[in-house]
């Protein structure tokens, strides 16, 4: 069975931030201040650590791609 983006991010140690999900943003955050934010209206996402751009792993990219698919972006 294929995992959802939320499940994939959880497996990578991210927590879903419900406060950000108001049909405008979706945020996943790690304890180390890494965050992945999807801005739904603008159809963009960002990955940062301590408010600075961050390199991502292949597994993070897979989770990001899955979230983009679920949002209908790709």
Briefly describe each language-model feature range.
Residues 55-74:
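Short, compact, well-ordered microdomains
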Residues 2-17:
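Amphipathic alpha-helical segments
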Residues 4-7, 23, 63-66:
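Short, well-structured alpha-helical interface segments that form or flank functional binding sites
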Residues 18-61:
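Acidic, low-complexity, intrinsically disordered interaction modules
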């Amino acid at each position: 069975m294929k995992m959802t983006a939320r499940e994939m991010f959880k497996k990578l140690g991210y927590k879903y931030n419900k406060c950000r999900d108001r049909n405008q943003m979706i945020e996943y955050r790690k304890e180390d201040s890494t965050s992945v934010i999807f801005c739904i209206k603008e159809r963009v996402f960002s990955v940062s650590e301590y408010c600075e751009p961050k390199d991502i792993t292949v597994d993070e990219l897979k989770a990001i791609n899955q979230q983009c698919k679920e949002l209908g972006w790709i």
